[in-house]
């Protein structure tokens, strides 16, 4: 399909761990495909290795998506780089775990947003917030970033280090008025799961609080719901399919 200018979309399309419906999640290849498909942004997850490197991967361990085992926090960058990332659809594909610096180097040549989720709710990574902000500043990408986490202490730490950063809360099921909670913390956005949109008054509460809404993970069946809700962004595994629906 021919891609239109992304700035015209009312609801932006962010690629969830890259175009992860087509390439192994959180790999450079997945992010490159998201760029080619015309996404407005990407979402990724960050951990810290034992030698202090910022590593892009969703899980705390490498077991699910690589040919290795173990926790990221216990492995060096060199050990992580030796692993091969694959998917059931591409078991013989040779992909590797990227660092955050490698992904940002790719994204800095675009005008796309980058949503970094700090994965420090199970394994704690002291100093992660400062390392990320330092790297982003060095790459002159501060205007392209938004930070999210289930660990709201981490979001507050980011705000303490730089009050101008954009942040969004991730939250578990059954919260009453998370938008007001986020506003009281000085957070800029809520990042609800797509089914949270069906909670009583949820959408109205977000709008009343004056916050942005970035919804995950919405694929074809749920995209119209997200569009109708007036979300500022949808986070999806299939950016090309999302674009078709959002632009109708």
What residues fall within each predicted segment?
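Phosphate-group recognition and catalysis centered on beta-loop-alpha active-site segments
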Residues: 1-248
């Amino acid at each position: 399909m021919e891609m239109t200018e992304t700035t015209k979309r009312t609801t932006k399309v962010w690629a969830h761990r890259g175009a992860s419906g087509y390439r192994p999640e959180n790999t450079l290849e997945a992010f490159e495909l998201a760029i080619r498909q015309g996404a407005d942004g990407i979402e990724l997850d960050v951990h810290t290795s034992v030698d202090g490197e910022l590593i892009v991967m969703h899980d705390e361990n490498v077991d699910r998506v690589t040919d290795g085992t173990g926790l990221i926090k216990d492995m060096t960058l060199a050990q992580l780089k030796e692993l091969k990332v694959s998917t059931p659809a591409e078991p013989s594909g040779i992909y590797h775990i990227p660092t955050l610096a490698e992904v940002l180097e790719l994204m800095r040549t675009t005008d796309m947003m980058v949503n970094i989720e700090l994965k420090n709710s199970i394994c704690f990574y002291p100093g992660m917030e400062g390392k990320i902000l330092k790297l982003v500043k060095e790459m002159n990408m501060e205007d392209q970033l938004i930070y999210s986490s289930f660990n709201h202490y981490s979001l507050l730490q980011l705000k303490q280090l730089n009050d101008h950063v954009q942040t969004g809360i991730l939250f578990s099921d059954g919260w009453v008025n998370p938008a007001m909670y986020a506003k009281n913390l000085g957070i800029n956005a809520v990042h609800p799961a797509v089914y949270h949109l069906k909670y009583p008054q949820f959408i109205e509460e977000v709008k009343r609080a004056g916050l942005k809404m970035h919804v995950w993970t919405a694929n074809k069946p749920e995209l119209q719901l997200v569009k109708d809700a007036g979300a500022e962004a949808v986070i999806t595994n299939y950016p090309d399919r999302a674009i078709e629906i959002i632009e109708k």
